[in-house]
């Protein structure tokens, strides 16, 4: 009797596992007992719960809030450019003569205290105020984009966890089926109905399916811990997290027609951010140009209610409080010189504007292509889902018939194993297609600046 290489290898693994020292097995059992003895808590988490937590704790949203407050403050205080610069001054001086004939007149001491104010009205002030208001409006839109993209990412991750959970369930179901097959085959072998090879094959299938369960569990829990960190949920180690939701939400996705392509570029957050940056750059250029080529007005005022002067030779003293006002107009001339820094600053702003225009044109093409691709993928997934359901129905009936035939002895173990593998594969293919559809729809909604769930007939959890 000859065995295949895979069968011999698997049998060797089984035999090796039986040779593990008993004290190691005892330690593992003790650790498992200690863990199970610890009281476990259970937390049920829905997609809406996860989104709500993420909106409160996500680092990107917090940073965007800080930037929003900053731009709001700068915009609401943009009028402060019209506030004068006010200073309080106090000074003392002493004057002496270099020649003796001027000694009496020039040997004096002066003390003064007063206030001075000055205000420069720049020709670019209006453009500066517009630039600050534009930056605030852009940040408002950016904050909304951050909130929306965070919600979309959290929901996608939630559905990914549901898919990984289905993989765990499939692996456990496979293990249970192989355990049942092994028990049945063992019973038949004891009665002399099947050969020893069938028993060894059933045992190999059972043992090799156990690591698959461990691998699926590890992938699920690692992803779950990353997800909990993302939404800012800290739980004790003894807490079990139960996800409340279903990949069947994919069945509620509406038909999305090609009409969404019309004007889709202007709805894109990426395009809008570039357009906001372009508008801000245009105001910055206007401010730089006005400051470089147009005159500015300067107003000044001084008042010295305390001004004391004393002649140190004659001891004569006098108090002479005074005030003065001034007005001036200045026109920068260096900006008219070729190669000056002022001209280069304006030219650099022009370059920035042209660069943003190129980026916007390119981004619109990219966004349009991306949305068309997603529409195609969504339509394909919806059609594929129908085929997946039919395939699963066929696999379930085929396995049931094969299992009944195996019980009667008209089908061998390999046929039953093949039928079971086909069934589990059909289930996973259905779940994978559902997750793919959900992911594409959520991404499309985000690219069109739509709230998550817009293209669902019911609110997905």
Where are these regions (language model features)?
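Periplasmic alpha-helical coiled-coil/stalk elements that build and connect Gram-negative outer-membrane
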Residues: 2, 149-267, 374-377, 381, ...
